[in-house]
Amino acid sequence: MPVAVLTLLVGALLFIGTYTATPYGSTATAQDVRASTLDKAAAATEEARVQLLASYEVTPGTYVDRGFLVDNVLHAGNLGDIHFSLLVPESYDVTRPASLFVTLPAEPGLYYQGAGANLQVEEFAFTAQGYDPNMIVVAPQPNDWTQTSANQVVELTEYLLLAYDIDPERVYLEGYSYGGETLSLVMDTKPQLYRAALHLASQWDGDVEALAAARIPLRISLGDNDEFYSVEAAQRVVGELRALYEAQGLSGEEIDRLVVLDVKPASYFWDPNEQHGGGSPRMARDPEVLGWLFAQ
């Protein structure tokens, strides 16, 4: 979180405190005092949010593709420009917090492969809408799957939490292939931003300690003979996570909820000889995979 976030929110809390001692007439009830304090607290918090939001610079997207405004750019200083496509449903209502789905691209959906390319080659951004028609969907387009890209995803998520009325308890993250590698680094950086994470046909590039400390549910799904990523590597990650949860004193049932390894047999895929490429649309349409994410 940028220093400005902390500064403004601390200022808002101090502002709130100045009103707890506001003198009231002798006829004022405790309920009156609390109501007035809460009103002023809300106003102070909103003012801080507006001021912080004004510190971000965003260039709007250039065209619309199936409801998504494509190639918005969040100018993020040292993190560079963050390109993303955004769907805000027509039903979005600022009085009713929305959920947020963040879908991270595989190749050939990275930004250097064309603005909006991820929307052309992956279905997750579209099939996810069937689980919650009021959900905001963002499809970032980093240029790679390194720590810089993970930091950009975190920054973009924090920006959207400020820009829209989003329920922070319903922010979901998914990544396929290279997108899964980026997801693993996001989970190593700031896992507490997300309700759950779906890691698909990929490998784990980050550490797992931060994820285990935050206890964010994780599902790893991949084919038993994926052409690029191994089941054995996924098993090692799951083993490390389970060991950390056991050290925390969690029960087997609790651990089973927090970490799921889902290895798909050849019969799951439309073409058993093309598990990696064919797995993306298959998993995007599978309620046991994508549906798991939104059930957390």
Model-derived features: where do they sit?
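N-terminal Sec-pathway targeting helices
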Residues: 1-7
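A domain-start/cap signature at the N-terminus of enzymes
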Residues: 13-98, 181, 186, 249-256
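Gly/Ser-rich "nucleophile elbow"/oxyanion-hole loop immediately N-terminal to the catalytic nucleophile
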Residues: 90-96, 145-177
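Active-site machinery of serine-nucleophile hydrolases
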Residues: 98-100, 104-154
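Short alpha-helix in the alpha/beta-hydrolase fold that links the catalytic acid
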Residues: 116-117, 229-247
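Short, proline-enriched alpha-helix->beta-strand connector loops that line the catalytic pocket
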Residues: 132-133, 212-218
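Primarily recognizes the serine-hydrolase "nucleophile elbow" in alpha/beta-hydrolase
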Residues: 169-212
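C-terminal catalytic histidine-bearing segment of alpha/beta-hydrolase fold enzymes
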Residues: 221, 227, 244-296
